[in-house]
């Protein structure tokens, strides 16, 4: 059963006439106009619009926390899945007015990454950001510039400007340098293993500062079996370095 149902209406600000786009639709979370106003970029679960975004095996139950994107044509009142074959979980998306591309913030394994999607053909590619966890981003309306800030396993937030044409990052402000000025952190390494059913479980381990491989240290094991992974951010409710 859906957690909620949502209705969407379009209000003509000149005549104040209301057009009902949909009523009490399940698994639909939000919508925004395309730059030309002819389509909607809709965020929801795979079960939205009668399940057209589902990509699961027969007998499996769809995960409503797996965020998906849809294009909704206002003339035909028909939706089409945009990220059905895209594995990461969609957190947020913006349809850029400058170049017509859709920029998607995703939960991708234990990373948070930005991807760009061409709505004309559905092709999705990763933006080469400089941090493991992108916290937030913003796009210029009239220039090929994306600003974002984020952090990684051993640094706090840094602010960058990203050239959409050249694909290059420019560090604007390093807050991490100020916050970690007097703090020593140990090394972080990836550590993956395969479960009994063959699934690769991705993990990592954190060494204490000034680690001596000839000494023995206590080990704390942290694991989480929920819908979202424990990501690689330095600053979280349970900072792994701490």
For the regions a language model picked out, list residue spans one by one.
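Serine-hydrolase catalytic core recognition
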Residues: 136-242
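Short loop/turn segments that connect beta-strands within beta-propeller blades
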Residues: 12-16, 73-77, 118-122, 163-167
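Generic detector of contiguous secondary-structure segments
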Residues: 15-39, 67, 151-158, 186-190, ...
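Beta-propeller fold detector
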Residues: 19-22, 80-84, 125-129, 169-176
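Conserved beta-strand position repeated across blades of beta-propeller domains
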Residues: 32, 94-96, 138
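Hydrophobic beta-strand positions that form the internal "hydrophobic ladder"
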Residues: 37-40, 101-103, 146-147
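Residue-level detector of Asp-centered blade-edge/turn motifs that repeat once per structural unit
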Residues: 35-36, 97-99, 141-142
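A flexible loop/linker signature enriched in serine peptidases of the S9 family
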Residues: 1-8, 22-29, 43-70, 81-90, ...
